Amino acid sequence: MKLFLRFLVASASVLFLSISAYAGEVVLKFHSFPPMPANSNAKFVKPWSEKVLAESNGEIKVEIYPAMQLGGKPPQLVDQVRDGVVDIVWTVAGYTPGRFPHLEAFELPFMPASAEATSQALQEYVDTVAASDLKDYKVLAVFCHAPGKIHTKEKVIKSAADLNGMKMRGPTRVITKMLEGLGATPVGMPVPAVAGALSKGVIDGMVVPWEIMPSFKLHELTKAHTTVSGSRGLYTTPFLFLMNKAKYESL
């Protein structure tokens, strides 16, 4: 995953370096739902923004607003960037059900391999099949997280039967259907709401990848963690790094 983030930092900055002329300093507002310590912000967006500033000779500055600091909820990020409320966002495609139907294919269970391999496949898929889903945006990058795991407050999950009747959080409609198929009672919500739901007993557990756990302190609220054996993981979700199309074309 770290290798792929370094690749994104290098490749995404090229999009800005290809622009030939600027009229003074341009300030771009970046908005996302994870807190600043999350890998997506600290190890991707922050170094990327610094690289953009340096290689544009100080003419393009990216202001980073993590944790929904500019208002709204995570599912609204795609509308915020499309409508020009902000200039750039990082979000989960499946937080807006039905908006990106082609991309939901990558949420199907037991599909993902590593984050790197699945992300490369997603990029090719977007370039060749799913471009219509993202026609209203300037796509800076698309990628997937490492295969998601099952995390529960107390109960150890050793088989699908152990999930029967458990209230389990899923991030998207495809993954909540998967949880329902496994016998759980699915509860859909973005990841920033998970800690509160665990603390209040709204859910018994959730599915998330390992790398997001520390950012939201979810490891402090769960005791049991279950992985899926084999070469394929349980699931993944596509991430979108998008820019307002008109803003990009104005540079």
List PLM regions with ranges.
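Bacterial N-terminal signal peptides that target proteins for export
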Residues: M1-A12
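Short intrinsically disordered, low-complexity coil segments enriched in acidic
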Residues: M1-K2, F16, A141
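Sec/Tat signal peptide C-region and signal peptidase I cleavage site
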Residues: F16-A23
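N-terminal secretory/targeting leader peptides
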Residues: G24-E116, T128, S132-L251
